[in-house]
Amino acid sequence: MAACNSNYTPKPKGYFQLQFPKKQYQTFNLAGYPYSFEYPKYASVEKDSLFFGEKAENDWWINIVFPSFSGRLHISYKQIGPQNQFDSLLRDSYELTQKHTQKAYAIEDSIITTANGIEGMFFKVQGDVATETQFFLTDSTRHFLRGALYFEATPNQDSLQPVQQFIVQDIKHLIQTFRWKN
């Protein structure tokens, strides 16, 4: 038997080669929503009526679904006011990001300031975490929007990295084209 005399060579782990679609964008600008932005044509927007089994806080929560990648960008919006004070919303956003510190080995944050006058923070959580990409956008007086990218897969940074990088480009485009309507 030839197989008995051959040397064993371990094989490295392999991942599927992904074919990414061409970057093309469309506008989300539905009547009644306090914001608008551009998102990729290979994604769809769905109204998010439930949040962990409970009714969503308001009608402006959405998911941007990436069906080819089994991912979704969860967008939650809150109007700043007596029940949603800016400091509290800001603290909640940081705390939600910090919940990943058990699995994360680093959290990078960068300030967002766009040509449209939008400000916020972009978080990259590194490690095998449920949501590596998170951000919030605000005008600090009326509007607060938070986004988090999730995949329907067990977190594995190595296998998700190519898809993560591809969709992060779309998220950054969304942020750059984002506008408050009022």
Residue ranges, per PLM feature:
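Short, well-structured beta-strand
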Residues: 8-11, 105-182
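C-terminal motif of bacterial Sec signal peptides marking the signal peptidase cleavage site
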Residues: 2-3
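Secretory pathway targeting signatures of secreted, lumenal, and periplasmic proteins
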Residues: 33-91
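Residues that act as N-cap/strand-start positions at coil-to-secondary-structure junctions
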Residues: 22, 29-31, 58, 117, ...
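Post-signal peptide N-terminal segment of mature Sec-exported envelope proteins
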Residues: 12-33
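Short, solvent-exposed helix-to-loop capping segments enriched in aromatics
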Residues: 90-99
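Short secondary-structure junctions
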Residues: 41-53, 98-112
